Design a protein with these regions (language model features):
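C-terminal structured domains
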Residues: 154-204
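Flexible, glycine/charged-enriched surface loops at secondary-structure junctions
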Residues: 102-106, 144-145, 182-187
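Hydrophobic, Leu/Ile/Phe/Ala-enriched alpha-helical segments that form helix-helix packing faces
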Residues: 91, 95, 99, 133-138, ...
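Charged, alpha-helical interface segments at or near domain boundaries
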Residues: 1-120
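Residues in well-ordered beta-strands of folded domains
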Residues: 60-64, 114-116, 146, 156, ...
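Aromatic-residue detector
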Residues: 63-65, 123-125, 142, 179-182
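Intrinsically disordered, low-complexity segments enriched in Gly and acidic/Ser/Thr residues
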Residues: 116-169
């Protein structure tokens, strides 16, 4: 993952509106997973790359805070008053301290764990703290993680049996194709996690 924050300038009017929304805010900053074609990139949202691609990025991490009115993504203008390292450190600390509700998945014979329906369920994959918990729950050295859409995450042991693997991939594909809940898409890939960290991704 690239730790460099990127962002394009917005119009002065847009910048002033966003800065006003977040000025003196005590709202917490969180990382948010987005696909590489996310419109926020053109609008100037700060981001770092999770999965690079030839023409930019396949998956990026945006950074934002929950204001009283809506969720506001940080832009390049925020770097005038906030340090980029401060932003990323605070975002990932807040994620680590967030209760994402990891629990066993009955539909996969309790041989999987998931976090679904919470604001930062999919972002749980970015937290070593939460991934180590998943390792322990599944008693697995290597994990396969599915985060096809926001608020959705399912995890199995990479060494699970064939039946569970097939169900897991089916569930991933079904969720990726299903837009009925309007959950924003992230990526049609599976992630391999070792020792709580992403080490590889498998495009499907």
């Amino acid at each position: 993952m690239s730790g460099t924050l990127h962002g394009k300038e917005k119009s002065q009017e847009e910048i002033e509106k966003i800065i006003e929304q977040t000025k003196n805010s005590d709202q917490k900053i969180y990382p948010i997973l987005k696909p590489g074609n996310w419109v926020g990139l053109k609008a100037g949202a700060l981001n770092s790359t999770l999965i690079p691609s030839e023409d930019g990025a396949e998956v990026v991490i945006g950074y934002g805070m929950d204001t009283p009115d809506n969720f506001v993504f940080l832009t390049k203008k925020h770097l005038e008053t906030m340090d980029s390292k401060q932003i990323t450190q605070e975002a990932f600390e807040n994620l680590a301290n967030c209760d994402t509700g990891l629990e066993f998945v009955e539909a996969l014979d309790n041989k999987a764990v998931g976090a679904n329906g919470n604001d930062f369920s999919s972002e749980t994959i970015l937290s070593r703290t939460h991934m180590l918990k998943a390792h322990a729950m599944l008693d697995a050295e290597e994990l396969l993680v599915s985060i096809p859409r926001r608020t959705c995450m399912t995890i199995i042991s990479r060494q699970t049996d064939e039946e569970i693997m097939n169900k897991f991939v089916y569930l991933h594909n079904y969720t990726w194709e299903d837009d009925s809940f309007s959950n924003a898409p992230i990526t049609n890939s599976l992630f391999i996690v070792k020792d709580g960290n992403i080490v590889e991704h498998i495009p499907l």
